[in-house]
């Protein structure tokens, strides 16, 4: 019998977002999350594929959506064949018994290429030597799963811990992506690129990442779903040590790390430095082109469109292992099902330097065209189907105008002609960008306290100047570096006002610590955080950061920020054209201001707008019990207006 522990829990607590939902009153109804002490256990026969006791094990449980909850949870159900997983593990073990080589330190040793198996999985021979995998007892004939535990339900995939009967009860991590996208090509590209990127980080950069044992990019394998099988690392997340809003007695960043006046900075810096070390390692090698990393022997790639000579710095025994192919940047694939995959691939790279257009300009241009083509396809589909939703069609037409402007301005923002920016040539070199560089994705191994980087999904190679700061330290609001000098009347303010300014200070402080750590490790690249550079790349980052249809307004806002600063940029050699490339009428300026205000009002007045209506399950349960969240007649949930003093 197979034992299946299922652990129910949420990984994060969200700030309240709503004019009608007061944080103070809500938080009185919410207790700090406690990880369940003991997982629920279910026993099942491995061969009994119809055992109803398994169903809960595959269902999404870490949150509830205020709208369309069942639909959202169904998309995150990760049902797979346990028997199929067992057969894959046993097949891997058979391969491992024939492989005693477990290290490839010398550049004269050829590292074996990924192996495509008859069961339509791909195994990694360099990671499955018998010395790494473990052995069976003499009286056992095959690998058997003993327990499976659901340990994490993330934004994009679910993670299971699989314990086997191999020596020392060898465990593995099984990652299964959610079927959030309408086409299989999205998941296929992401998995194939992520595995190749992890392999690159392991072999070329010598970084600590979980080794991939086996993977499948589609559902035609024994598990019946795409998956990645990795080594299991026993440890705890670095996120446990990260408290971004911790109190800071000095209320000033200048005191520095380890100061007796402000010892709290040492705690924050411990996390920041660990993340900055990974960041520096990712940027320790530059590439000859941009895109995403794949294996050269990937049969699903179009050999005519990939770039072979990806870098001049590769080890001699690894030069024929990887190529650059289509970018898997999330926004470039998200909600693009109305556009045929063949059409999408035209604008996904890879991109290489040419005499007329820099890599950066090519990426900006193609990103804009891709969004434009997708919006046009959506509009055509709506009109063809005779949709009566004229508001949506009007909105899409506004998006089309926005993306046309991004395409128009794409060649005027970032180039080697920006002489006023120090080390501009270095900033334009493509390096690896990790979109989820976050303490949540760093595991500290228990025995050695070695940090391992997890989850490289969506990683891309692109110019450093186009890379934004990690989200865990990102802050675009007003900066406060020293509460005493920047806010001299601080002590006279109300408690609510003081908390507001302290919040801005803490966000400023965290960003400052990050930029300081980057400067210490990559001083030639620090200009990427300079305010003018951020403004120049803002149209690009605003496109990538879109979460809802109305976020095109934020892309428009980047144009107006640029227009305001353009004369200054030209005077100081940051741009080459004297005239701002876009023109707007007074009516358009007024309309944008109205649209931007409406968008901000909607974000402020809509509870949990920042998470598109998703609420962590423990918070949801507490708010339901408190009468704050109520189920309506349609099956959706509404948030009650409650008394702040209650």
Swiss-Prot record:
Which InterPro entries does the entry mention?
Kinase-like_dom_sf, Mito_inheritance_9
**Subcellular compartments:** Mitochondrion
Task: Give the UniProt keywords, A-Z.
Answer: Mitochondrion, Transit peptide
Which domain of life, per UniProt?
Answer: Eukaryota
GO cellular component labels: mitochondrion
Task: Give yes or no: UniProt keyword NAD.
Answer: no
Main localization category: mitochondrion
Q: Does the keyword Manganese apply?
A: no
Transit peptide range per the UniProt entry = 1-34
Q: Could you say which protein family the record assigns here?
A: Belongs to the AIM9 family.
Q: What is this protein called?
A: Altered inheritance of mitochondria protein 9, mitochondrial
What species was this sequence derived from? Answer: Candida glabrata (strain ATCC 2001 / BCRC 20586 / JCM 3761 / NBRC 0622 / NRRL Y-65 / CBS 138) (Yeast)
